[in-house]
A protein has these predicted regions:
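Short amphipathic alpha-helical segments and their helix-coil junctions
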Residues: 14-18, 188-218, 226-229, 319-352, ...
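A cross-family structural signal marking well-folded subdomains
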Residues: 245-247, 276-465
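Basic- and aromatic-enriched surface patches that contact anionic nucleotides/nucleic acids
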Residues: 2-280, 284, 555, 561
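Intrinsically disordered, low-complexity N-proximal targeting/linker segments that flank membranes
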Residues: 393-533, 537, 542-545
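Short, hydrophobic/amphipathic alpha-helical patches that form generic packing surfaces
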Residues: 40-43, 228-236, 277-288, 355-368, ...
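Conserved structured core elements
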Residues: 32, 220-224, 228, 240, ...
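Long, cytosolic, alpha-helical-rich C-terminal regions that act as interaction/scaffolding modules
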Residues: 547, 557-587
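Short beta-strand-alpha-helix junction that forms the catalytic/metal-binding core
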Residues: 24-28, 33, 518, 528-561
Length: 587
């Protein structure tokens, strides 16, 4: 095994040189997360103020034992803030998340921000500081205030601090000027950290030598292949990369010259690992004339090592560096995202199509569209979302749609696809038809309301043929629609675009529920139905609706959870709030 905390490196390979790191002597095989964490302590504050997406490492100057976690033996606490949590985390070693009420109170008291306001925007990391800290100071600021003797220079620190903006500066200055500021202790700690030796295991040359089989193949890429095998073995330890991320890492090892293009094009669209997968599949699809399967490690290895595929390799590299951006811009226009159309997908749903329904996104990139009329784009977007949200065989739908659009890019081709793929979709109905079918008992029919059930009252029938017809016509749509939050996000697309304009769906860490800037708020509070022991005869009926999208709205995390028992009429007391929540006046 590899000792904890070590880096694993290897001598840089000439074939992997790229302009941004052509002087690098070694390449990192394992320890990327540790390297990124260490780098936080050296990020220049000026660069942080210019880039709101950076995380910040802080040191709390407070030494009061009463403010330390009960199980801590430290003199000082390190804290971190991230774009998803610009207010920081709880004061312990676990990655605890601060409660919405605490965040809301702090923003109101310190920044005069009302999270319930329609104009509220989440602060950036440089505008905030860890709110669960007393005197936080960026570690990079402390390091930049060290003098040539390796001592923390108090005057230089105060001078650097005076150039900073933020709500934390006043407390920091007061602490530094105060009598309890332990300059020597902090200096000693920083000096120890800066003088520490980071241990790295240099991969033995024998591990990187070509195997007998590779020597016989006369392949110039054998060095990279051996590193690939080593990297895969290392990936069995620590934080594992998923299959697609591992493939992307191997692609970067073989063809580092495409990395810059992929990083740039992926921003605000999708993760780099998905974009590279789609780009390779697109060229492979065009060369074969049939839909290429998702990439595998063996596919990449064959492509890299087969001397007969040199032309294909060059075609892929040229496409990514010269044409991929234009192709993605075309897809942006088709899905109504850039330029933004009233019917277009918000970025989060655009990214969802690419990540959860990649065959559908691949189909959009695989067709060489000319400039398309808006009505066609809108209809095609409708078909894509129909397939994504109500389709049960998206590979078949995408393949048939690709074939039909190759013959003619027209609305007729889209209609033909729906007809040919009717068995691949849940049947949809017009809103008025659905409203009539799901008609609920009236208030003067209390017994029917008490016993109402989705299946019993809508699908089941004493006539077996009638029940089968109800099930085939309606059940698939009802089951999908009730829980599909993508439909909810689309209904609230204007609000999502405006309120969360800085949300970047290409960052996988922001997909996690606790990192996403919105939460799903129960309009009728769940507190009235969840685990409630009551004699209310209508509770069963309410529970069946409480967790459907009809009772949800996407709402800012900081403002949600403040009204867990507040009735809908009170929290939706403005017309604009109703509109943003996609609720009509009569509802």
């Amino acid at each position: 095994g590899i000792p904890i905390g070590f880096f694993v490196i290897c001598k840089a390979i000439a074939e992997q040189r790229k302009t941004s790191d052509d002087k690098a002597q070694y390449q990192l095989l394992d320890g990327q997360q540790r390297a990124n964490a260490i780098a936080l302590g050296f990020n220049d504050w000026n660069s942080i103020e210019k880039d709101s997406k950076q995380s910040i490492l802080w040191l709390d100057l407070d030494t009061n034992p009463e403010n330390m976690p009960s199980d801590s033996s430290r003199n000082f606490l390190f804290r971190v803030t991230t774009p998803a949590h610009p207010w920081g985390y709880t004061k312990n070693d676990a990655e605890g998340y601060l409660g919405a009420a605490k965040i809301r109170t702090f923003l109101k008291d310190k920044l005069n921000l009302d999270t319930s306001s329609l104009k509220y925007k989440r602060p950036t990391t440089c505008e905030l500081a860890p709110i669960d800290a007393t005197c936080p100071v960026p570690v990079s600021l402390l390091i930049s205030s060290m003098n040539s003797n390796g001592e923390l220079d108090k005057n230089l620190l105060l001078d650097n601090l005076s150039k900073c903006k933020g709500i934390w500066t006043e407390n920091a200055e007061e602490a530094i000027r105060g009598s309890k500021f332990n300059l020597s202790l902090i200096s000693e700690g920083l000096r120890t950290a800066l003088n520490s030796t980071i241990l790295a295991i240099n991969t033995p040359a024998k591990l990187l030598e070509p195997s007998l089989q590779e020597n016989q193949s006369d392949n110039s890429r054998s060095n990279i292949t051996n590193i690939e095998h080593l990297f895969q073995r290392l990936n069995q330890q620590g934080t594992r990369l998923d299959g697609e991320e591992l493939i992307y890492s191997l692609i970067k090892a073989y063809w580092p010259e495409i990395t810059t293009s992929i990083d740039r094009i992926a921003q605000n669209r999708m993760a780099c690992s998905r974009l590279i997968n789609l780009a390779f599949r697109l060229i492979l699809t065009e060369n074969s004339g049939t839909f290429s399967a998702p990439l595998s490690i063996s596919t990449i290895r064959r492509l890299a090592k087969d001397t007969e595929k040199e032309q294909l390799r060059e075609e892929i590299i040229a496409f990514i560096n010269e044409k991929l951006d234009t192709v993605c811009q075309t897809v942006d226009a088709i899905l109504g995202m850039k330029p933004q159309s009233s019917w277009g997908l918000p970025p989060v749903l655009y990214s969802e199509i690419a990540h959860q329904h990649q065959d559908l996104y691949l189909m959009l990139t695989a067709k060489k569209y000319q400039e398309l009329p808006e009505d066609f784009c809108r209809t095609l977007t409708g078909l894509i979302t129909y397939a994504a949200w109500f389709g049960n065989d998206q590979r078949t739908i995408a393949s048939i749609l690709y074939k039909n659009l190759n013959q003619q890019a027209s609305i007729e081709a889209l209609q033909k696809t729906v007809k040919e793929c009717s068995h691949c979709f849940a049947r949809l109905h017009q809103p008025d038809e659905a409203a009539a079918f799901i008609a609920l008992p009236s208030s003067d029919q209390p017994d029917q309301i008490k016993s109402w059930n989705w299946w019993k009252d809508l699908i089941a029938d004493s006539d077996a043929a009638k029940q089968q017809e109800n099930e085939s016509q309606w059940w698939g749509m009802l089951c999908t629609m009730r829980q599909n939050k993508s439909l909810l996000l689309y209904a609230q697309r204007e609000f999502i675009r405006k309120r969360f304009s800085s949300y970047d769906p290409s960052r996988k860490d922001l997909w996690l529920e606790h990192n996403r800037p919105w939460d799903y708020d129960h309009i009728l509070p769940a507190a009235y139905t969840y685990n409630i022991k009551t004699n209310n005869e209508f509770a069963g009926f309410c529970k069946q609706w409480c967790n459907t999208i009809g009772n949800f709205r996407a709402w800012p995390y900081e403002d949600n959870r403040s009204d867990q028992a507040e009735m809908a009429g009170k929290k939706l007391n403005q017309t604009k709030l109703l509109e943003d929540s996609f609720i009509s006046d009569d509802e």
